[in-house]
Amino acid sequence: AEITGLPSLGDDSGLEVESLDGAPGIFSARYAGKKGNDSLNNQKLLKEISLKKNRSAKFVSILSFLDPELKNPFFSYGELFGKIIDSPKGKGGFGYDPIFQVKNSNLTLAEISKTERMRISHRTMSTLKMITLLKESKIY
């Protein structure tokens, strides 16, 4: 916003595993290193959590919106709760989806439909909250 002079929207999302003190967190995409990929990230996470009893995890998305003509930014937050399973299941999605089992479900994100993934997504939640904030502000 400062550089372009235009309103800007930013997203920071990641996976937080309770027994790993919130890791991988903001490093989710680079968890296995700079040359890592989804498969290597999943392998590293599964290795680190292998001896842990608590496998609770959540996907988190935080959006920030700033209009350079306004003084205060808007922030919204979305979460999707679940747990990390022992091995990958499913072919859909990306990232940690094959090892993330959605709370109150027997399915991983990689096993559910794209439509359902989008409906329950942490990013969808934070986006809907942002839309509400902007509408309620009566600025947009």
Feature-to-residue mapping (PLM):
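Anionic-ligand binding patches
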Residues: A1-Y140
